[in-house]
């Protein structure tokens, strides 16, 4: 992405915004004084927008089904209890410095039959308004960069305990919307991706609990094309991700219930590779000397597969990329909800660490959820003290045990 030098100050603001979300889709592995930074395009695709998940450190691949299951694990939609549902999720961003950057997400689903469920989602991330000026202060116009994704979900319940699901999406990233011709234009980037997921839920009999179950889920998301912003530029990988988790749910008595979840995430994107010549000069590995780093020449699928074993530090480096989420939820009469979680990202995956808290209220068909993020490291982050709000509804018959 190249801009006129005259607008460098404004571009630095945009760069800061992009880097703040890029931190969600990058990791840093240090070796021999080098930083092996993994970056992707459209990192907003990994942001969990719903307040229920956010209140539990963004667990979601194995929690009970809800309106936002399409993001976390589309296979869960087949296990949702009501016939129809929809929700809106709102997440303000960088509130410490501006009030016009936010991520909004809308979800909806409908049961086609007791075993088949379809859904749709829309995600819109606005990067605010940027006023471009030249070196003399002359007005060059206003840009309102944004990113957008339109998604469809489908889930099929194979048996009482097992379901599978898939999602498909169109992604648009417009980082120069409205910029004047005095700035080198950045064409909109587009990409297509799919998710494949599975969800297993088994009832258990444990101690004095009235009811209990164990859920296990897996979702490989954003498998798809690279995204490119110019004809001459190199396309970027989108944030392909693998999530694997388990959730235990327990009903203590007719009024009290709880859940506890553990989830692991790994970004399935190649790690940059470096070489050092006889003079000690360090550069990206470029075996065919075409000025394009070898890892960038990998296709999406090849890059995804090699990401399991391409770290310079071997298996230790691969394990250092894994993000851990721990979350819990307590419910009273399935009406009042209290949530908490712990998010741990190793230095090799970005270094974010925070605790979360959340509240929920369900009244008739409506549900309102709120979450709050509190960092626990000295390093300041644009995510500090972030909140998310969700409102949704579910209607129709209870299809909890209606299958086949």
Model-inferred region functions:
Residues 26-404:
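Subset of outer-membrane beta-barrel
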Residues 1-28, 246, 266, 328:
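Bacterial Sec-dependent N-terminal signal peptides
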């Amino acid at each position: 992405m190249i801009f006129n030098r005259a607008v460098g100050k404004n571009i630095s603001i945009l760069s800061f915004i992009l880097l703040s979300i890029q931190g969600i889709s990058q990791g840093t592995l240090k070796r021999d004084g080098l930083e092996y930074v993994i970056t992707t395009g459209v990192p907003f695709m990994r942001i969990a927008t719903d307040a229920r998940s956010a209140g539990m450190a963004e667990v979601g691949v194995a929690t009970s089904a809800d309106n936002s299951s399409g993001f976390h694990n589309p296979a869960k939609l087949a296990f949702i209890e009501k016939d129809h549902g929809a929700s809106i999720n709102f997440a303000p961003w960088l509130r410490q410095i501006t009030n016009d950057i936010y991520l909004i997400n809308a979800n909806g689903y409908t049961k086609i039959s007791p075993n088949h469920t379809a859904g749709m989602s829309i995600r819109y991330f606005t990067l605010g308004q940027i006023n471009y000026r030249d070196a003399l202060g002359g007005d060059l116009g206003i840009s309102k960069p944004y990113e957008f994704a339109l998604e469809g979900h489908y889930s099929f319940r194979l048996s009482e305990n097992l379901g599978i699901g898939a999602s498909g999406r169109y992604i648009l990233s417009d980082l120069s919307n409205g910029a004047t011709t005095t700035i080198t234009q950045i064409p909109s980037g587009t990409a297509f991706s799919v998710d494949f997921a599975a969800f297993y839920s088994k009832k258990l009999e444990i101690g004095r609990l009235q009811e209990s179950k164990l859920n296990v889920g897996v979702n490989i998301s954003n498998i798809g094309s690279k995204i490119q912003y110019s004809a001459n530029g190199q396309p970027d990988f989108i944030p392909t991700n693998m999530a694997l988790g388990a959730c235990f749910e327990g009903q203590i008595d007719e009024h009290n219930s709880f859940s506890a979840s553990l989830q692991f995430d790994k970004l399935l994107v190649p790690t940059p590779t470096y070489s050092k010549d006889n003079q000690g000069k360090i550069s990206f590995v470029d075996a065919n000397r075409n000025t394009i780093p070898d890892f960038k020449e990998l296709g999406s699928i090849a890059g995804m597969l090699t990401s399991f074993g391409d770290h310079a530090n071997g298996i230790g480096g691969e394990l250092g990329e894994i993000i851990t989420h721990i979350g819990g939820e307590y419910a009273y009469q399935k009406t009042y909800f209290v949530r908490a979680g712990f998010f741990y990202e190793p230095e090799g995956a970005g270094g974010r660490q925070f605790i979360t808290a959340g509240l929920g209220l369900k009244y008739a068909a409506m549900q309102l959820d709120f979450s709050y993020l509190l960092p626990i490291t000295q390093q300041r982050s644009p995510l500090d003290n972030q909140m998310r709000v969700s409102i949704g509804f579910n209607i129709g018959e209870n299809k909890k045990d209606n299958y086949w």
